[in-house]
UniProtKB/Swiss-Prot annotation:
A Pfam family it matches: RuvX
CDD domains assigned to the protein according to its UniProt record, in alphabetical order: YqgF (cd16964)
Record-listed E.C. numbers: 3.1.-.-
Principal subcellular localization: cytoplasm
Annotated source species: Synechococcus elongatus (strain ATCC 33912 / PCC 7942 / FACHB-805)
Gene Ontology biological-process entries: rRNA 5'-end processing
Keywords of the record: Cytoplasm, Hydrolase, Nuclease, Ribosome biogenesis
Protein known as: Putative pre-16S rRNA nuclease
Enzyme class: hydrolase
SUPFAM superfamilies: Ribonuclease H-like (SSF53098)
One MF term in the entry's GO annotations: nuclease activity
Function: Could be a nuclease involved in processing of the 5'-end of pre-16S rRNA.
Length: 149
C-alpha cells in the first residue's frame, strides 16, 4: 500500500491555503491558512508544517485559464512554487485547480456558513480539494505527471 506524505497548497496573492492527508491517503483536511507577507515568512510557515508532518511532496494548485492556457496568476504561482521547492528542498507537482475556490465556497454555503466571513476557510478547503484531486489521480492507472524539483 502506498504511503503519502504530501501537503496541498492553494497559493493566492493574499493567502495560502494548506491541507494535509493521512499517511494512507484516505482522508484530507484543511490545516491552516497562511496570510502572506513576504517570501521568507511564507517559507518559514510552510517549512514548519512540512517538518511537523514529515512531508515529502508539495502538491500545488495551478490556476489555468478556462481555455487551458497559463495566465499571469498561474505563472506567478509557478515562480513561487519553484522558489519554494528550492528553499524547502522538496519536490513539487501541480494540479489543475480551476474552480476549486468556487467549489470550496459552495461547500461552505452548503454547510450553512458564510464564505465572505472567513476567506481563510475557502483557501483551506480549496487546498484540500487540490490534494484530494492529486490523491485520486494516484489511484488511477499509472500516468506520468508533471512532478518536478
Amino acid at each position: 500500500m502506498p504511503y503519502y506524505a504530501a501537503l496541498g497548497l492553494d497559493v493566492g496573492r493574499r493567502r495560502i491555503g494548506v491541507a494535509g492527508c493521512d499517511r494512507l491517503g484516505i482522508t484530507v483536511q484543511g490545516l491552516t491558512t497562511i496570510v502572506r507577507r513576504d517570501f521568507a515568512s511564507d517559507v518559514a510557515a510552510i517549512s514548519a508544517i512540512a517538518k511537523e508532518r514529515q512531508v515529502e511532496l508539495l502538491v500545488i494548485g495551478l490556476p489555468y485559464s478556462m481555455d487551458g492556457s497559463l495566465g499571469s496568476q498561474a505563472k506567478q504561482t509557478q515562480r513561487f512554487a519553484t522558489r519554494l521547492s528550492k528553499a524547502l528542498q522538496l519536490p513539487i507537482t501541480y494540479v489543475d485547480e480551476r474552480l476549486t475556490s468556487f467549489e470550496a465556497e459552495e461547500m461552505i454555503k452548503a454547510e450553512g456558513r458564510s464564505p465572505s466571513r472567513d476567506k481563510g476557510a475557502i483557501d483551506r478547503k480549496a487546498a484540500a480539494l487540490i490534494l484530494q484531486q492529486w490523491l485520486d489521480e494516484q489511484r488511477e492507472p499509472r500516468r506520468f505527471g508533471s512532478t518536478q524539483h
